[in-house]
């Protein structure tokens, strides 16, 4: 099993979309990239923690590659808007790929380069080493499935 951690706006919609991909065996929403190893939704919404809302995926690379996950990532959000997705604005809604190793970093950079030619605006998606990931509160997990 491998892990991918991706920021692409409010985590509720992307979580359900990623959960339907063949090869994704588990999803979890959380916060990543911030100043501390623990935080809350309320704190993240202040914009002072520097965390992004993210979806963490456990996936089987024999069924789906990290590259295919990233291509899907670019299909389901607008990577050309800075710190916003749809009606949501703030640094917690930024487009960001959090890599776990050099191989994921290289793949991320290549996919961004390839995807840049598909969009009319420049992709603003950041790539960063995973830092201070923590799961979101239970009520956020599988939020849209519970409704």
Task: For each feature predicted by the language model, list its residue ranges.
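Flexible coil/turn and secondary-structure edge motifs
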Residues: 1-147
């Amino acid at each position: 099993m491998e892990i991918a951690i991706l920021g692409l706006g409010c985590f509720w919609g992307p979580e359900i979309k990623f959960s339907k991909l063949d090869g994704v065996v588990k999803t979890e929403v959380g916060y990543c990239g911030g100043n501390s190893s623990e935080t809350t939704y309320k704190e993240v919404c202040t914009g002072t923690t520097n965390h992004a809302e993210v979806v963490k995926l456990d996936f089987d690379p024999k069924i789906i590659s990290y590259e295919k996950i990233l291509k899907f990532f670019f299909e389901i959000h607008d990577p050309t808007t800075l710190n916003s997705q749809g009606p949501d604005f703030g640094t917690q809604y930024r487009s960001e790929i959090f890599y776990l190793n050099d191989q994921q970093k290289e793949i991320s950079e290549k996919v961004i380069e390839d995807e840049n030619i598909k969009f009319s605006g420049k992709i603003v998606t950041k790539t960063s080493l995973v830092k201070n990931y923590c799961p979101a509160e239970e009520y956020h997990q599988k939020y849209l499935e519970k409704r």
